[in-house]
Amino acid sequence: LPEDLGKFDAIVGRRVLMYLPDPQRALQLLIQHLKPNGIIAFQESDAIKCGVGGDRLPHHQEAIQRVWKTVQAEGGDIHIGQKLYDIFLRLGIESPHIEAEAVMQTAENNDLQWLTEIMIERMRAHHIVDDDFTLDQFKQEMTEEAEENKAAFIRDMNFGIWGHGLFL
């Protein structure tokens, strides 16, 4: 980062650390640009417990796994949320505040068809789905499964963390 970037009251990010090769180093560079008593806050998704509650929804379960396998194939850390507290501590941020929230969805109200549709080319590029995989068939199977099985499930977890940076 340029040294003349300045100082900020807060630095926030969402779903970015999971895609960085060295998130701790990135945060280390960022906190140098915090004002005294500045806040650094991040929210990251995590695949922990994904699919819990959806035992009667095998197509939904497969869709969740395809999304996470694609992110992982692209170099994303699908468990970064669980690591945030330790990373903040290693940066010298004392007593960071951390929360986790389950992203609950239902068979009839979820974003898995949309996610699959926008990620389909990425899924194909990483061989997560075969060339014969069709969105129309997938959507039909998901819709039929939702009509037959009313269930709620955890799609993923959101981890949020914030703390005050150290200033030397």
PLM features: what roles do these ranges have?
Residues Q24-I39:
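A short glycine-rich, Lys/Arg-flanked "PGG" loop and its adjoining helix->strand segment in the class I
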Residues L91-E94, D156-L168:
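Core SAM-dependent methyltransferase catalytic element
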Residues A41-N110, A125-I128:
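Conserved catalytic/acceptor-binding region of the Class I
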Residues D9, P58-H60, W114-E117:
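Short, hinge-like loop/turn segments at secondary-structure boundaries
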Residues L1-I11:
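A short acidic, Gly/Pro-enriched loop at the edge of an enzyme's catalytic core
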Residues P21, K35, I93:
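Short conserved AdoMet
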Residues G13-L17, Q43:
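Residues lining the SAM
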Residues S95-F153:
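C-terminal helical/coil "lid" or tail adjacent to the Rossmann-like core of SAM-dependent
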